[in-house]
UniProtKB/Swiss-Prot annotation:
One BP annotation, GO: L-proline biosynthetic process
Name of the gene encoding the protein in the UniProt record: proA
Family indicated by similarity: Belongs to the gamma-glutamyl phosphate reductase family.
Function text: Catalyzes the NADPH-dependent reduction of L-glutamate 5-phosphate into L-glutamate 5-semialdehyde and phosphate. The product spontaneously undergoes cyclization to form 1-pyrroline-5-carboxylate.
Keyword GTP-binding appears in the UniProt entry: no
GO molecular function: glutamate-5-semialdehyde dehydrogenase activity; NADP binding
Listed EC numbers: 1.2.1.41
PROSITE patterns per the UniProt record, alphabetical: PROA
The organism's place on the tree of life at top rank: Bacteria
Keywords: Amino-acid biosynthesis, Cytoplasm, NADP, Oxidoreductase, Proline biosynthesis
Keyword Disulfide bond: no
PANTHER family for the chain: DELTA-1-PYRROLINE-5-CARBOXYLATE SYNTHASE, GLUTAMATE SEMIALDEHYDE DEHYDROGENASE
Protein name: Gamma-glutamyl phosphate reductase
Amino acid sequence: MVEVYARLRAAVARLAVCSAAEKDGALRAVRDALHAQREDILRANAQDLARAREAGLAAPLVARLALSEHLLEDMLRSLTVLSLQRDPIGEIIEGYTLANGLEIRKVRVPLGVVAVIYESRPNVTVDAFALAYKSGNAVLLRAGSAASYSNAPLLRAIHVGLKKAHGVVDAVAVPPVLEEKYGDVDHILRARGFIDAVFPRGGAALIRRVVEGAHVPVIETGCGVCHLYVDESANIDVALQIAENAKLQKPAACNSVETLLVHRAVARPFLHRVQEIFATCEETTRKPGGVDFFCDAESFSLLTERGARKNVFHAQAETWDREYLDYQVSVRVVPNLEEALRHIARHSTKHSEVIVTRDRARARRFHQEVDAACVYVNASSRFTDGGQFGMGAEIGVSTQKLHARGPMGLCALTTSKYLIDGEGQVRP
């Protein structure tokens, strides 16, 4: 492992003297190599999916594992977008001159060697490499075994592209397989002095393991127990449109909505129509009603008053803290905005929270009082994504408050240093 770390550290030094044009050219070459190997990538992904289903892997993990022509095109597009973005390295964040003539500049520099530990998400392989390379970092990619078939051609294409562009091939590496299960992960987490930062991407168990076991700095990407509050002043059609997008478009995403909070004044019309909309995905989910509802007493009564009971269940105490990542949703009727805010404060994972309202004062209050990385008024939580935010890609969505918060693009992979120029000044 130490030899791997040494090669990565040497790669950082080589990247430091690469021009922005050279790095951008390498990204475009990798894009072209991925495009050339797209059939191999999709065949390999099909092997991963077959193995995952045979092993009984949880549905959300299978969904995150899947690649398609459309997703591959998104990956290629993100490489193009990143290659066109301004290089953050060397940017002067601030600069000033002291009374004694010292010129001080605070400039942006790479973190150094970063490790990304992630589960069954082959797209992370490409995104993490691209963001790290563009921002002058070397990256150690520790992927979950569920995506091993998919990652092989992805990594092969990355290396082919870098070689063709005369790039820094050693800037991306994978850890060697150790005899002890998760031994490589434990080694990475203890690699103080070798690894500058670790980014975990995955479920609660993975993130907890990394955070609790790390001796190196961790930039945490948190789970998403995201809420949608439908205010009494909401345009119901807008609320329904957002609910459908935020829950059904990609339930396995961390930015999908997991809890519906509905003002009592609009609960009946909203919930009845949500029930109808969610039922349209029955063919996909192969369950009655399409989506399972876990309800407080009031919403249970409303959702069952027209006879539907097979997919409506009573909520338990732990319901409100569940990240389903599936065609399931928690529902609660609230008397006012205050109770919605209290519920969110108790159960939010500080990822993405949404209010649908036509009342500007309530919208402003929601913006101010909700403690989350992304707070939305009249828009879907599904926008919490580096690509959607115009970053090209993301290393993850940070729910912590130090260093970075929200979707993390190029700048989240940088830190700063001070450059001081003088003419012989000494401190009096």
